[in-house]
């Protein structure tokens, strides 16, 4: 059906409408960047405040592609804010990205992210408070357990902000982020997961393609270096790095997503050794995961411990299907 122009236009409208509402809605952290795991209401305004690495990497890539097509400044800002959050809050000293941030801090869900009106009054000027009252629901009732989770209201999502309004929003973001960084942060799961880092490396490479921000490229390369140094041993990948040790045999997603990330990085700067590594990873993936009798790829390697069933993932769920990404990268490599 997508061969018909009107169907392509409809599909693109559905895509952009969804991503625009996500950008302004409560599922996106308006103050500090990064997307929460899911929403708890049908308007996508009040999230469960956990943030997952595997959500933000692919969303970063998706918004980068959307900006490349539309040149809409909103999407450029989402890309920048999400990448900044990844570098500020998720990148570990050794270079990899942490797996997730908890929803709770000090035992209270959302405490790090929500505001009392008196706190906002003390931090913002009159014009900024008026902006939040008009565009972010501050003039109404508190929307989360007696506090405000700030997001742009549904009516404003259909309109474009003026340059003056955008400047006001940016000032609000800077002031509230500075204040929020003084709070007790949510707990961080500091495991480095190969597959999740690979998704994020791809997203950061796509963001660099759009923004040409060298810090973003360096961040992606630091994560890749950790994987190469700590999780690639004796020609095989480990799935997890924690407390200085790589462990667990790599799964299909680790190989397929990492090859995909390498190919994305190679689009923005060329390194022959990384292409060679991608080919090497592809050879291991074929050797260790391919079902030579029935086709497709198993999630676990042939030398993995015996399981009652060896799954094959063909449908996208919380993350892309390993078989789909494996097929794509093998085609790109010419297999």
For the regions a protein language model found, what residue spans apply to each?
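Glycan-recognition and catalytic cores of secretory/periplasmic carbohydrate-active enzymes
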Residues: 1-335
């Amino acid at each position: 059906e997508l061969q018909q122009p009107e169907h392509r236009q409809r599909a693109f409208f559905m895509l952009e409408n969804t991503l625009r509402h996500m950008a302004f809605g409560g599922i996106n952290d308006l103050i500090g960047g990064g997307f929460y795991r899911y929403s708890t209401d049908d308007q996508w305004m009040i999230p469960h405040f956990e943030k997952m690495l595997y959500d933000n990497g692919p969303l970063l890539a998706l918004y980068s592609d959307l900006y490349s097509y539309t040149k809409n400044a909103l999407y450029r800002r989402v890309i920048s804010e999400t990448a900044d959050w990844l570098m500020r809050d998720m990148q570990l000293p050794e270079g990899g990205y942490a797996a997730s941030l908890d929803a709770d801090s000090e035992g209270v869900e959302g405490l790090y992210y929500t505001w009392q009106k008196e706190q906002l009054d003390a931090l913002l000027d009159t014009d900024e408070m008026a902006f939040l009252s008009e565009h972010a629901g501050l003039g109404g009732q508190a929307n989360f357990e007696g506090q405000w989770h700030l997001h742009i209201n549904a009516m404003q999502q259909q309109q474009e902000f003026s340059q003056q309004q955008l400047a006001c929003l940016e000032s609000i973001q800077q002031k509230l982020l500075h204040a929020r960084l003084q709070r007790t942060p949510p707990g961080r799961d500091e495991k480095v997961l190969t597959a999740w880092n690979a998704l994020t490396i791809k997203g950061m490479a796509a963001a660099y393609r759009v923004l040409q921000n060298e810090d973003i490229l360096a961040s992606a390369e630091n994560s890749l270096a950790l994987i190469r140094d700590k999780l690639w041993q004796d020609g095989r990948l480990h799935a997890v790095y924690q407390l200085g040790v790589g462990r667990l045999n790599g799964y299909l997603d680790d190989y397929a997503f990492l090859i995909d990330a390498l190919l994305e990085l190679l689009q923005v700067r060329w390194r022959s050794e990384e292409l060679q590594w991608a080919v090497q990873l592809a050879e291991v993936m074929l050797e260790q995961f391919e079902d030579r009798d029935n086709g497709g790829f198993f999630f676990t390697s042939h030398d993995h411990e015996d399981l009652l069933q060896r799954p094959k993932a063909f449908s996208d769920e919380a993350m892309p299907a390993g078989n789909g990404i494996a097929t794509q990268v093998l085609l790109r490599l010419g297999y």
